[in-house]
């Protein structure tokens, strides 16, 4: 089987990831579980050859020098794939994550209605957070698509690597990938402010300088979408502030309290019928009360403010989990595994 056939099999079986690992058969992750494909183990030369087949010369050079690489590529008519190629003690390995060629709309994702409002904010910072594989990219792509279909403007994305490819609809869209199109998130963000964007998507707020530039862009009148690997709104605020040295923390809290629009923290759970996964969200809207808590570093009080903020579209993760259990979409056990207060989900 060549890599194209393996990827076609992976997509057909609705796998999120294809794992190629020297010494083992190919494996796919379906609805969160890793399963073996009924094929003989791959040798190092097999995996190495498959990886090289989908790389260009520049990527091969990086892989040889750095021993690992992130990149994306497409098979026309099938899907795009985000690839991490690396080495382990048995030899070459790679993980190929499927990026569907069709960008799902917010409606198709059954996303809360307020996500559409976040997508059309004229300025400010909207963060989508959660662990790896929680669907952050899918949610953000749907929000960017909503903006693209409803407003006239310029959307600039900075990604590592480019995942969903957007067509320009009402908006002009320019997508830049770290590596081929820019040397770093920081360089691209500095340039972005001179590229007349209305909206900037930053693939990952991974260090102090990127966070500083994203905050600055949001403060100067741009809509900025970004992701972090945090599991709640409170942890997101703490993570951003903690990156900065002590003498800057107060200034960062002030900037964040003025520019933040919303934090969506999401996780994916198996559906009760076992046929797929569903996203559960904590949603924090930057109301005057929330802005005040950020400014005054009263992050511990944020959870109760979200709990009582349903009138403006806020919800805690546990409130959303309760609703999903009540609607028979997920089991009590699945809710318990993700809940902040598992004791509220007996059985």
Identify the role of each PLM range.
Residues 1-347:
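Short, flexible helix-loop junctions that flank or precede catalytic/ligand sites
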């Amino acid at each position: 089987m060549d890599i194209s056939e393996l990827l076609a099999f992976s997509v057909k079986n609705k796998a999120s990831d294809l794992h190629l690992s020297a010494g083992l058969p190919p494996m796919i992750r379906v609805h969160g579980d890793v399963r073996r494909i009924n094929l003989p183990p791959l040798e190092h030369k097999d995996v190495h050859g498959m990886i090289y087949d989908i790389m260009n010369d520049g990527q091969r050079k990086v892989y040889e020098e750095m021993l690992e690489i992130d990149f994306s590529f497409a098979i026309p008519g099938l899907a795009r794939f985000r690839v991490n190629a690396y080495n382990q003690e048995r030899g070459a390995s790679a993980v190929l994550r499927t990026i569907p060629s069709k960008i799902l709309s917010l409606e198709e994702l059954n996303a809360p209605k307020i996500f559409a409002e976040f997508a059309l904010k004229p300025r400010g910072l909207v963060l989508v957070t959660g662990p790896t594989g929680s669907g952050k990219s899918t949610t953000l792509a749907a929000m960017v698509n909503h903006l693209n279909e409803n407003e006239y403007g310029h959307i600039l994305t900075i990604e590592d690597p480019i995942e969903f490819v957007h067509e320009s609809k009402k908006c002009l869209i320019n997508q830049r990938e770290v590596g081929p199109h820019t040397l770093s998130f920081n360089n691209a963000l500095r340039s972005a402010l001179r590229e007349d964007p209305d909206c900037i998507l930053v693939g990952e707020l991974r260090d102090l300088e990127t966070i500083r530039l994203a905050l600055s862009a949001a403060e100067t009148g741009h809509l900025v979408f970004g992701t972090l690997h945090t599991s709640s709104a409170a942890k997101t605020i703490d993570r951003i502030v903690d990156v900065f040295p002590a003498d800057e923390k107060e200034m960062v809290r002030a900037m964040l309290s003025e520019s933040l629009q919303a934090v969506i923290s999401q996780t994916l759970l198996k559906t009760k019928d076992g046929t797929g996964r569903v996203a559960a969200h904590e949603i924090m809207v930057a109301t005057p009360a929330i802005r005040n808590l950020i400014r005054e570093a009263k992050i511990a009080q944020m959870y109760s403010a979200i709990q009582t903020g349903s009138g403006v579209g806020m919800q805690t993760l546990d409130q959303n989990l309760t609703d999903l259990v009540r609607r028979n979409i997920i089991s009590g056990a699945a809710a318990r595994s993700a809940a902040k207060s598992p004791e509220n989900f007996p059985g």
